[in-house]
């Protein structure tokens, strides 16, 4: 299937934009804030929480980073005004990380403070491994500065993740644990499917044992079952953890989790730059392209649900 996945990715630039938009409709709320609002309302009506992500092009100057900050402030105002059950997820490159650490830190503080003023929460996404050190450094700095309404993401496929958990343990961190999708060399990330699964379970055990609040982010039903087992063994209340999934993916599994009484948060991306975002994400991991194509065509391809 790897050859098919890569072939699909190579074809994407030649695919008419309306077709790409149709393919991505289930996975992206739409171009405008109102689209995210309606998606979150539907999710809330189904008993699901949300996290909203503002999609943006690669930031090339401070004005573009400032525009992303303002967009998040608009999101917080909309969440509060409409009474939505949602927080936000931010990417540090969108806040100017590649332009300078201090600029990014100042922008993140602005977003986190605005969230705090409205009783909301900010999840700092993890990007490729070139940003891991600065992301974890910034998370620690904000937590030590007294900002408790901020969390971070750890990727189970990175070989360093369990060690990172030990470093963060004193913070009792709020962590989204996911597998990770960026293409990384084998000395940095596990590539074997079962090795990633095993490290996910190990990382989840470590996080729960240090008292972290964990968003168990996966569409892999085996890992969902392992997560349920681990929280049950520790007799955790449902308020002490949550599951997380992407918009439009494994909706059957999402319904079962909610029906069984687990809290579930859905990632809701929106923005006018949906096209560039879609192409970039698919190119970062060709397996996603194959997954979306198979899912859209209603075919069942073994191994796809193990993302």
Predicted features and spans:
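Positively charged, amphipathic and often flexible ligand-engagement surfaces
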Residues: 1-307
